[in-house]
């Protein structure tokens, strides 16, 4: 009966705008994760930036996940349709600009600007476009669902996000092998332009907009940042938790070089998708199993499992074991991710939970910012020069285990009595 009810809600419970928004999100994830899969290798080798390329990839990741804090004010002011159109227009320009850096026909332009300056500008332009997507799509899901359909609506949204993360790198592989790595960025630009056209043609502004008096202004955002960053108990936990994301981003920043140069498997994009496919398959049963465990223990177990996965990679040079290790990492991710937001909500002052939760994704941004230069150092030191590629993954494991210990220490000293 429950299954039949869910199928009926799936068939009749959502208006067209809900489906349009989610399809746009799926194709945007194709473009984002397709480019993400090759970006480190592309900047380091094709564009010729060396280890600095890894640092810039990290800077780009930081901007993509930090700027939505500010972008929400733009969405509130101009609405979802205009913001989405601007997002995909900027994405189209940004991805294409990044792709130009690797095209022989554009080298005169790139060199006239300065190779590093050009790439930094192109990446930041792309990140500005990326900052608009999440407030628009998540906001549309919120406005086009009700109490009966909201849970299923968000489930559909997150499933499509993960599906995009799983298929994007595979599409990138086909383009890289067929045309060249620089054309992966061109592909992302074309997909983004297609999303722009689809937005203008099919996306309707959902009802229930934010009243003018309740819209967030930049002044309000910066005031909230002062409050949140001034709360040591809250912000210190986010910094500690960023250790997980430092490990996670190595799947895109360091692993491609290892898979190609050490494992001698040229199609590194396939290995990058293991995490996403595993998450799709195991999230529901793992979440059910972890539901009765206290959030701090669920996160600790998840951190420990994810950290240990890198020791599997370090232990031997093996494609099957590397695949198993990344799946093991995804298991750790699935164990802790749902409980993170529950725990962070408990850390926030009771009367300011909404404000503080708006900054809960900062660990993703901090992790990317640190993971970029760390990746450049790991690849150069252990893989290119040191002849000890396993050492890269030992360092990642140490970061994870130290973060796990610090998380327990933080919980011991800062958890309020009676908290979960």
Segments the model singles out, each with a brief description of its role:
Residues 2-15, 209-239:
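Juxtamembrane intracellular "pre-TM" segments in multi-pass secondary transporters
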Residues 32-40, 232-272:
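Extracytoplasmic gate region of multi-pass secondary transporters
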Residues 64-66, 267-292, 302:
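Transmembrane alpha-helices of Major Facilitator/SLC transporters
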Residues 67-80, 176, 281-295, 379:
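Helix-to-loop junctions at the C-terminal end of transmembrane segments
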Residues 89-114, 304-317:
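C-terminal ends and interior cores of transmembrane alpha-helices
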Residues 113-116, 174-190, 377-401:
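A membrane-interface helix-boundary motif in multi-pass transporters
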Residues 151-176, 192, 360-372:
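Glycine-rich segments within core transmembrane alpha-helices of 12-TM secondary carriers
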Residues 194-206, 394-420:
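Multi-pass alpha-helical transporter architecture, strongest
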């Amino acid at each position: 009966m429950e299954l039949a009810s869910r199928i009926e809600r799936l068939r009749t419970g959502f208006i067209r705008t809900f489906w349009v928004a989610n399809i746009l999100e799926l194709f945007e994830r194709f473009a984002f994760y397709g480019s993400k899969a090759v970006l480190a290798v592309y900047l380091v080798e094709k564009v010729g930036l060396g280890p600095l390329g890894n640092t810039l990839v990290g800077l780009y990741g930081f901007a993509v996940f930090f700027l939505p804090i500010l972008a929400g004010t733009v969405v509130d002011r101009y609405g979802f349709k205009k913001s989405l159109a601007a997002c995909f227009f900027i994405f189209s320009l940004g991805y294409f600009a990044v792709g130009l850096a690797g095209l022989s026909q554009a080298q005169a332009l790139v060199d006239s600007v300065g190779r590093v300056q050009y790439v930094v500008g192109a990446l930041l332009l792309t990140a500005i476009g990326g900052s608009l997507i999440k407030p628009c799509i998540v906001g549309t899901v919120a406005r086009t669902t009700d109490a009966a359909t909201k849970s299923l609506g968000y489930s559909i949204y997150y499933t499509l996000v993960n599906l995009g993360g799983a298929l994007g790198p595979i599409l990138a592989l086909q383009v890289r092998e067929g045309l060249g790595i620089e054309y992966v960025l061109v592909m992302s630009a074309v997909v983004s332009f297609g999303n722009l056209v689809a937005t203008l043609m099919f996306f309707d502004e959902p009802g229930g907009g934010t009243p003018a008096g309740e819209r967030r202004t930049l002044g309000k955002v910066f005031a909230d940042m002062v409050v949140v960053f001034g709360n040591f108990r809250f912000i210190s936990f986010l910094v500690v938790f960023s250790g997980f994301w430092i490990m996670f981003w190595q799947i895109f920043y360091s692993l491609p070089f290892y898979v190609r140069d050490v494992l001698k498997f040229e199609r590194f994009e396939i290995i990058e998708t293991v995490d996403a496919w595993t998450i799709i398959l195991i999230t529901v049963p793992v979440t059910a199993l972890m539901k009765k465990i206290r959030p701090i223990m669920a996160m600790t177990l998840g951190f420990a499992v994810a950290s240990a996965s890198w020791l599997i990679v370090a232990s031997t040079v093996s494609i099957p074991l590397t695949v198993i290790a990344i799946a093991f990492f995804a298991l750790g991710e699935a164990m802790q991710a749902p409980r993170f937001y529950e725990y962070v909500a408990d850390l926030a002052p009771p009367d300011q939970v909404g404000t503080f939760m708006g900054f809960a994704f900062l660990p993703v941004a901090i992790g990317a910012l640190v993971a970029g230069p760390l990746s450049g150092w790991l690849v150069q030191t252990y893989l290119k020069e040191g002849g000890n590629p396993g050492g890269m993954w030992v360092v990642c494991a140490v970061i994870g285990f130290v973060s796990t210990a610090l998380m327990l220490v933080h919980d011991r000293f800062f958890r309020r009595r009676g908290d979960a």
